[in-house]
Structure formats: structure tokens, C-alpha cells
Swiss-Prot record:
This is Adenosylhomocysteinase. The keyword Plastid does not apply. Keywords: Cytoplasm, Hydrolase, NAD, One-carbon metabolism. Pathway: Amino-acid biosynthesis; L-homocysteine biosynthesis; L-homocysteine from S-adenosyl-L-homocysteine: step 1/1. It is an enzyme of class 3 (hydrolase). The gene is ahcY.
Length: 415
């Protein structure tokens, strides 16, 4: 079978979802028009491990319009939207994804998409890139892209160890990605996931945001806007100082764990909410992850110090600790915005996925010309994406005069 989804009968509903996303992704739809006419990806096979959402569907069908054959697997066992997966399968995309995959299912699906011998790898988190390298499956790969901070860190480590076998474009590093997707998109979708899972009031709560990168900045600002008192936990002195001057309290996790009501991780690192932190927490504390993998909260440790567990609501589990306190874990410690909600709004994914589509085209156009390194999105592409979005929104920006352009190039004239 050239696809494996939970229920193909959901395809009609999935198509409605995809069409709704298309309406809110005008920049990517503009690229699709060009791709459909020019077929820049004709004959190219793409293997993708991405969150299977309605927005991803718009990207995948844009690549298909450009002539590519795509095999898609989910990048998180709990983030796949089953109706969207069915809609894509019905439209000829090789989809191997469903919500609720086991770890075995997850890697089986990666193996399935690699049977198509892709020329381009698209990844969200770096698992696919790592898998093809560990299993010596890189010979036909022209290049790849990476969507996330976590994945870029892994790929940079591969580059430094000189084991990276093909060029990769770090879509995550584009201005039109991290300024909007990481900050604004994650900020809104994280709050959305927390509210869907808990239906609690944010105003008046003490919200602890662990990590103050672009994702943490976005989450902290949204909590603040909804009336929470926000505490930031950071290990970087620069980001800690920035958080302080943005108006947030800054302290260690040991201190924050004793006073927080809601804890959200956004670091991409291991056990930033540890067993010891959990034991310090208030009765009723809520834990959520918006980083990447389900390692930021020590879920194993939480289970070991619990005497009783029960599901209170969908995506909300109660753990009763030996000390009598109750701790509430959202989405099993996985990405709360994609498991308990639907991920980022289409409008911000429009920007990220324009970068993905144009980066794939760039890799194909420059086949054999790029080194086996991690590259940023070319600035011309980044700027093109911003201009496409502004045009779609009906926004005109100022153009410098010839005199102004000349002035900022010179060095002779000062005060």
C-alpha cells in the first residue's frame, strides 16, 4: 500500500481543513501558482518527516504542484491530524502517519518513506536526517531542510563532527521563520493548547517559562498579555538580562518551582523540569512542554514518585505524589500546542512553509554546488518571502530614493 493512515473515510473532512488553511496561506499559494506553471521539482522525490497538519498539507501539495513525488511521515506520535492525513492520501501523497503512533510505528513509518529513495529530505527535529546517516542511506540525497531549532542543533553537531553527507538548509534560521513562527506562532498555540486541555483562567496565575529563546519570548509575552505573573528561568546571562528588562521576574528553577502555577518548557534540553523540581511544586501545578521532544519534563521521574495516576480530561493527566500533592501533566509531556491544540495558525506557517518550498527549489537548482554544511536560508529567499506576505496582506512599504541608497553606502560624511 502506498499510504498508511488511520481512516481514509475522513478524507472529505480533511480536504475542508486543507482548503481552510489555503485561504490563510496566500503567499504559499502564490508560490504554488508558479510551481504549477514551471515544474521546478519535476522528477524529484521528497521524503518528509513533519507534523501532519492542514498547514503541512498546503506545503506538500505545493511541492506536488511543482512536479515532486512526496512521501510523508509524522514527526511526533501524537501530532498527526488524521483527517488531513486521509485527505492527502486521497490526493496521491504517500502518507504514513496517524495520531497515537507507538515508537515502533514512528520508525516503521520513517523506513516506509525511505523506500521511495528521496532526493531531498525535509525534517522537523532531525530524526530523519539522523536515521539516513546512521543507516548509510545518503547516496541519492541531494540535500535537505530542517524546520526546528532542535534539529538545527543536531545537524550543526553532525557538521562539526564532519559526518554530514549532504547540504542542509536551516529553515529555522530565516528571519521570516523565527520572528513569526517561533515567537508569535508558538506563543499563541501554546496558550491555545493549555486552555483546551485545562480550561483554566490564566489571569492571576504564576506562569513559569523555562527558556527565553524566540519560543520562550513568545510564550512569556502571551501569558503576560492574559494577566499572568510571569517568571522566566534561563541559563544564558544575556537572555536572562533581556527577560528581566522585558519586565519579567527571573530566577532559578529551584525557586520558581515553589511558587509557579503553570510551567512551560521551551529549551530543547533534557530534564529542565526534574523530579526534584516536581517535588517542590504546589498542589495542582500544571506542566506543559513547548520545546520539542518529550524529554524536557522528567516524565519518567514523575511516574516514579507518583502513587496514583488518572486521566482527568483529554490530554490532561493527574499524578498523585507520595507527598499527597497532585501534579497535572499536559499531552504526556509532548508538544502541547500540537497535541492538545492544532499547532500554529495558518498565517504564520505561511511564512515558514514558503521558506521550505523555496529552499527545496534552491537545493535542486544548486545540486552539486553546495558543500556538506548547514546553510541559512539565502537572504534573497528570506526577503522574497517577506515581500510575498506583505503583498498578500495589501501592505506597501517605503522605497529608498537613489540619494538615500547612495548615502548609506558612503563613509566620508558624518556630523
Amino acid at each position: 500500500m502506498d499510504y498508511r493512515v488511520k481512516d481514509l473515510s475522513l478524507a472529505e473532512q480533511g480536504r475542508k481543513q486543507i482548503e481552510w488553511a489555503e485561504l490563510h496561506m496566500p503567499a504559499l499559494m502564490e508560490i504554488r501558482k508558479r510551481f504549477n506553471a514551471e515544474k521546478p521539482l519535476d522528477g524529484i522525490r521528497i521524503g518528509a518527516v513533519l507534523h501532519v497538519t492542514k498547514e503541512t498539507a498546503v506545503l506538500v501539495e505545493t511541492l506536488k504542484a511543482g512536479g515532486a513525488e512526496i512521501a510523508l511521515a509524522g514527526s511526533n506520535p501524537l501530532s498527526t491530524q488524521d483527517d488531513v492525513a486521509a485527505g492527502l492520501a486521497k490526493n496521491g501523497i504517500h502518507v504514513y502517519a496517524w495520531r497515537g503512533e507507538t515508537e515502533k510505528d514512528y520508525y516503521d513509518n520513517i523506513r516506509e518513506i525511505l523506500k521511495y529513495e528521496p532526493h531531498v529530505i525535509m525534517d522537523d527535529g532531525g530524526d530523519l536526517h539522523a536515521y539516513v546517516h546512521e543507516n548509510n542511506l545518503t547516496s541519492k540525497i541531494v540535500g535537505g531542510t530542517e524546520e526546528t531549532t532542535t534539529g538545527v542543533i543536531r545537524l550543526k553537531a553532525m557538521e562539526e563532527e564532519k559526518v554530514l553527507k549532504y547540504p542542509v538548509i536551516a529553515v529555522n534560521n530565516a528571519f521570516t521563520k523565527y520572528l513569526f513562527d517561533n515567537r508569535i506562532g508558538t506563543g499563541q498555540s501554546t496558550i491555545d493548547g493549555i486552555l483546551r486541555a485545562t480550561n483554566i483562567l490564566i489571569a492571576g496565575k504564576v506562569a513559569v517559562v523555562i527558556g527565553y529563546g524566540w519560543v520562550g519570548r513568545g510564550i512569556a509575552s502571551r501569558f503576560k498579555g492574559m494577566g499572568a505573573r510571569v517568571i522566566v528561568v534561563e541559563s544564558s546571562p544575556f537572555r536572562a538580562l533581556e527577560a528581566l528588562m522585558d519586565g519579567f521576574d527571573v530566577m532559578t528553577m529551584n525557586r520558581a518551582s515553589e511558587i509557579g502555577d503553570i510551567f512551560v518548557t521551551a529549551t530543547g534540553n533534557l530534564n529542565v523540569v526534574s523530579r526534584d523540581h516536581i517535588l517542590r511544586m504546589k498542589d495542582g501545578a500544571v506542566l506543559a512542554n513547548s520545546g520539542h521532544f518529550n524529554v524536557e519534563i522528567d516524565v519518567k521521574g514523575l511516574k516514579e514518585i507518583s502513587v496514583e495516576t488518572r486521566e482527568v480530561r483529554q490530554n490532561l493527566e493527574e499524578y498523585k505524589l507520595r507527598n499527597g500533592k497532585r501534579i497535572y501533566l499536559l499531552a504526556d509531556g509532548r508538544l502541547v500546542n500540537l497535541v492538545a491544540a492544532e499547532g500554529h495558525p495558518s498565517e504564520v506557517m505561511d511564512l515558514s512553509f514558503c521558506n521550505q518550498a523555496l529552499s527545496v527549489e534552491h537545493l535542486i537548482k544548486n545540486k552539486g554546488k553546495l558543500e556538506n554544511k548547514v546553510y541559512n536560508v539565502p537572504i534573497e529567499i528570506d526577503e522574497q518571502v517577506a515581500r510575498l506576505k506583505l503583498k498578500a496582506l495589501g501592505i506597501e512599504i517605503e522605497e529608498l530614493t537613489i540619494e538615500q541608497k547612495e548615502y548609506i553606502k558612503q563613509w566620508k560624511y558624518g556630523t
